[in-house]
């Protein structure tokens, strides 16, 4: 079991203010966590590849498709600064050519 001094040090590092009852509770909980890691360290993981998660997560996206907005002309003409079929927007990047 973890001693009080270790719990106090961990609480200090975590910027936690705990009372003596909480110290006892944290000591039991931290000891349980360390016991669990001790059990895990007994497993043979030599042929197990390192990973950051239990299952692979990937984005599921649809394919992009190019299509016109039904009222494209109306939309462009009602914009603050239309230029042909496009929106004129303020420049946000400076280039060396300016």
UniProtKB/Swiss-Prot annotation:
EC code: 6.3.5.-
GO MF annotation list: asparaginyl-tRNA synthase (glutamine-hydrolyzing) activity; ATP binding; glutaminyl-tRNA synthase (glutamine-hydrolyzing) activity
Name of the molecule in the record: Aspartyl/glutamyl-tRNA(Asn/Gln) amidotransferase subunit C
GO biological process, one term: translation
Species, as recorded: Microcystis aeruginosa (strain NIES-843 / IAM M-2473)
Keyword Nucleotide-binding: yes
UniProt entry keywords in alphabetical sequence: ATP-binding, Ligase, Nucleotide-binding, Protein biosynthesis
Subunit structure: Heterotrimer of A, B and C subunits.
SUPFAM superfamilies: Glu-tRNAGln amidotransferase C subunit (SSF141000)
Annotated function: Allows the formation of correctly charged Asn-tRNA(Asn) or Gln-tRNA(Gln) through the transamidation of misacylated Asp-tRNA(Asn) or Glu-tRNA(Gln) in organisms which lack either or both of asparaginyl-tRNA or glutaminyl-tRNA synthetases. The reaction takes place in the presence of glutamine and ATP through an activated phospho-Asp-tRNA(Asn) or phospho-Glu-tRNA(Gln).
Reaction equations catalysed: L-glutamyl-tRNA(Gln) + L-glutamine + ATP + H2O = L-glutaminyl-tRNA(Gln) + L-glutamate + ADP + phosphate + H(+); L-aspartyl-tRNA(Asn) + L-glutamine + ATP + H2O = L-asparaginyl-tRNA(Asn) + L-glutamate + ADP + phosphate + 2 H(+)
Family note: Belongs to the GatC family.
